[in-house]
Curated annotation (Swiss-Prot):
It is found in: Periplasm. This is Tol-Pal system protein TolB. NCBIfam families: propeller_TolB. InterPro entries: 6-blade_b-propeller_TolB-like (IPR011042), PD40 (IPR011659), Tol-Pal_TolB (IPR014167), TolB_N (IPR007195). The keyword Signal applies.
Amino acid sequence: MKLLKRLVSVFAIVLAVGSNAFAGDEVRIVIDEGVDGARPIAVVPFVGSAPEDISKIVADDLRNSGKFNPIAVSQMPQRPTSAAEVNPEAWSNIGIDAIVIGQVVPSGNGYSITYQLIDTVGASGTPGTVLMQNSYTVTNKWLRYGAHTVSDEVFEKLTAIRGAFRTRIAYVVQKNGGSQPYEVRVADYDGYNQFIVNRSAQPIMSPAWSPDGQRLAYVSFENKKSQLVVQDLNFGARKVVASFQGHNGAPAFSPDGSRLAFASSRDGVLNIYVMGANGGTPTQLTSGAGNNTEPAWSPDGNSILFTSDRSGSPQVYRMDASGGSATVVGGRGSAQISADGKTLVMINGNNNVVKQDLTTGVSEVLSTSFLGESPSLSPNGIMIIYSSTQGLGKVLQLVSADGRFKASLPGSDGQVKFPAWSPYLTK
């Protein structure tokens, strides 16, 4: 039996910070557009009962990636409880080449989760072959995490891409009233298990994760001026790392976590600077006319993307991380490069989320929601979260990188904006 103590350690850090600041009104996924055309798969209801529906969580995760289209339970030709009970032909006849079965049973002060991934068409040799199996013991609090672990393993086995269902998102909520209406929150990628990291009477903006997932940098106006704050998620300790005259904003950790790129108008014009992650004397990278903001590092740390209106309207530019000349990339702003360096996501002139292949230069519009902002990629590049305007407020939106699946994560207690997807939080 495999215990998830090591795997949940980083998640426990966030829970420790938020243990006295639970946010009851969570953001939850509401499907806007399904995954027709994705690979059909079956996640058979797990045997046994628990406070969380493990098989539904697994099916939802696979669906959210845009790579899979889990069939409804009512469409399943059988509901096997073991590999021996699986009739491969019954599944292959309806176009299903892999199924997930499992069970969840009480174990001590928690539950044991066991699953098997089964090949129904013989792609691995013989129909009915168990492609993968595993079991975990988790406490009640970590049931969803255990389900996300199943999802990650199944996803990676079937796609050869590391799953990102055990990652988290940080975002800002502006509540409807109260003495401290601005909050930085962290939640599972799907909006569950939400906690407040910090709250303030003054605006908070632009949270950014450190590459080890243990710190958040964000913009705070708590002292009546914009400051960059880095908060340790182990202990909750906060440090102001930039409080220069003028505006200080848009922090971004370098890939090795040692530096922060940010925008500041300390000299009268908004420019891109780089300094140590713990503060210090900044180095100015951009200059000249126009405002420069929203820096984002390339995966190798050698270059920085940023938004500038130097040409008269906002566009995304790219320059060496040590400074120098900049070249136009395109789009309107909020650029981010995938971890493999192959894909760029950004906002275009119509305020839509766009994906650009950096090898071919081909672009694809992924969203047509109103006033899209702040797109953030999952660490495997498979999903994108961003904010948009619905009615009179801001909500989070999720879209798969292939555009197949779209969903909203509306907040019930205020406007939700500035999403940032965490790095991988497990080894």
